[in-house]
Amino acid sequence: MITVALTLLALQPAFAQTAQSLPTIDLYVGMHRLQTEVASKPADRATGLMWRKSMPDNQAMLFIFNSYALHCFWMRNTFIPLSIAFLRDDGSIVNIEHMQPQQETSHCPAEPVRYALEVNQGWFDNRNVSPPMKVRGLPN
């Protein structure tokens, strides 16, 4: 039994990168389109962008939670620098945090939210996106 558990643990990075097939939607911030993977299930939210080596510039991941809370994020097993926008239900940005790879510092919203949007670090800054701008196209 221990051997099986250790084998599965050893395979986790490879499995995590290939097994996650998430639905995608288009989100819009100003005139900018983001092809966005949607992580709405607990396992998908827990994995997020872990194990990935890169992400195309106009891609993102949207995290959808069932309840309003101070949903905090960290960068364990995440190899690309990211920025995260915490969003109200109307799509308005509460705050944006910048996160460094492999760091376990918590990054939290300034108020309880149900949505968080991760992009490559610098994506928001390079497009002059800041609170309280709105992200359009959020699913209900």
What are these regions (language model features)?
Residues 17-140:
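Compact, glycine-rich, soluble single-domain proteins
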Residues 1-12:
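Bacterial N-terminal signal peptides
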